[in-house]
């Protein structure tokens, strides 16, 4: 999850932050370029990501639903960095326009079987807290999925396959977008390119608009899976993280959709 505000980009390190640092391979550079192109407004980004976290870990620490075994206090890290950014920009004389956030989160909730209703409830609390504490006016969701072709880690997973878990989180994210006028679809790139295990792929339950032949029929599973792996770092045995080109496309889509939403 990262937050965005209009203004110049800057870099600053904050004490006790447990958030990840940027390694440059992410959606942010293309987002900034495209958002500026579409709106004429410069952008400052506060990166507030931490991989492998369920939505419960991003809740304010005083929330009864907050759950983080390592007590990283991610919400407080996010808001501390954000407020410091505002202070820095104010001091430099920049006029701050829209305050927005972009959220690319959900894979871990797929893994731990977070129910649709609980995800909606917790995401809404994070969203409302960011609005209240930081004055953010709108958020964009990057819809997520899980490892393409993955059925489960063991036979105990097969009764509740990852395909069903992905659908549960997708329904939650779609519901949040549909039922809140201040939450939009940033990008469905990741979800659109996800495919489940072969059995679920070949069933009528799975629909795709990506893995189709010239007649509009589903591709054979092996061909579809090979295509799905083009957008992740599969050659390096990384089947869940997007390639840099895929992340650029996601950043581009989020910027276009946010710009159109005003």
Question: PLM features: residue spans?
Answer:
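Cell-envelope and extracellular/periplasmic
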Residues: 1-262
């Amino acid at each position: 999850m990262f937050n965005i505000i209009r203004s110049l980009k800057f870099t600053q390190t904050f004490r006790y932050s447990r958030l990840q640092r940027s390694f440059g391979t992410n959606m942010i550079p293309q987002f900034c370029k495209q958002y500026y192109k579409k709106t004429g407004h410069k952008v400052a980004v506060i990166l507030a990501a931490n991989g492998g976290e369920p939505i419960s870990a991003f809740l304010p620490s005083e929330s009864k639903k907050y759950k983080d075994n390592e007590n990283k206090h991610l919400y407080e890290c996010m808001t501390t960095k954000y407020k410091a950014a505002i202070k820095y920009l104010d001091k430099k004389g920049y006029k701050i326009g829209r305050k927005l956030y972009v959220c690319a989160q959900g894979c871990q909730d797929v893994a731990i079987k977070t129910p649709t209703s609980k995800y909606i409830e917790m995401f809404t609390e994070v969203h409302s807290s960011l609005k209240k504490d930081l004055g953010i006016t709108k958020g964009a969701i990057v819809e997520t999925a899980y490892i393409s072709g993955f059925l489960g880690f063991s036979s105990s997973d097969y009764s509740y396959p990852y395909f069903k878990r992905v659908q549960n989180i997708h329904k939650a994210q779609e519901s949040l977008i549909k039922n809140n006028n201040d939450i939009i679809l940033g990008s469905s790139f990741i979800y659109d390119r996800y495919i489940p295990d072969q059995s679920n792929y070949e069933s009528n339950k799975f629909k795709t608009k990506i893995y189709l032949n010239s007649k509009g029929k589903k591709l054979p599973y092996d061909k579809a899976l090979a295509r799905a792996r083009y957008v992740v770092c599969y050659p390096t045995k990384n089947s869940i993280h997007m390639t840099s080109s895929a992340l650029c496309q996601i950043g581009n889509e989020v910027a276009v959709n946010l710009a159109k939403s005003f």
